[in-house]
């Protein structure tokens, strides 16, 4: 029974970081905020939909922060250069990394220190 796709990534944020998360993932990256299930209580959670695919990012309150330098989530976009420009215009630093064929990409960090890869998929890896 193979996996079908990654449905969501859960990303830690600091207590009281809801507005910062909304600015980074919502206002800056253009994701649509969706309500988390009421059973979770609400205040320590901010969820976002990515397009119409059903993919989601779930921000949750956790003071331990990001765990390792390689931990990250990747958001696929059509135009990484335009997204990079938007991030930098909003004060977020970006950095290049190893080139992967057909995957123009760069990295940034959300307001909570989580590493975020922004990438386009132009074809197969090789």
Positions of the model-derived regions?
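Core segments of cupin and vicinal oxygen chelate
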Residues: 11-54
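Conserved beta-strand in the GNAT
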Residues: 57-60, 117-119
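Short acidic/glycine-enriched loop/turn segments that link adjacent beta-strands
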Residues: 40-44, 67, 100-104
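N-terminal beta-strand motif that seeds the catalytic metal site of vicinal oxygen chelate
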Residues: 1-22, 71-73, 124-126
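Vicinal oxygen chelate
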Residues: 1-4, 88-126
């Amino acid at each position: 029974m193979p996996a079908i796709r990654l449905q969501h990534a859960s990303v830690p944020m600091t207590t009281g970081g809801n507005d910062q998360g909304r600015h980074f993932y919502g206002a800056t990256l253009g994701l649509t905020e969706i309500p988390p299930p009421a059973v979770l209580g609400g205040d320590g959670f901010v969820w976002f939909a990515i397009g119409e695919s059903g993919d989601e990012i779930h921000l949750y309150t956790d003071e331990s922060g990001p765990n390792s330098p390689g931990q990250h989530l990747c958001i696929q976009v059509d135009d990484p250069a335009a997204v990079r420009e938007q991030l930098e215009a909003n004060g977020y630093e970006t950095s290049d990394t190893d080139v992967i064929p057909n995957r123009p990409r760069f990295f940034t960090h959300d307001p909570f220190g989580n590493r975020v890869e922004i990438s386009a998929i132009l074809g197969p890896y090789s």
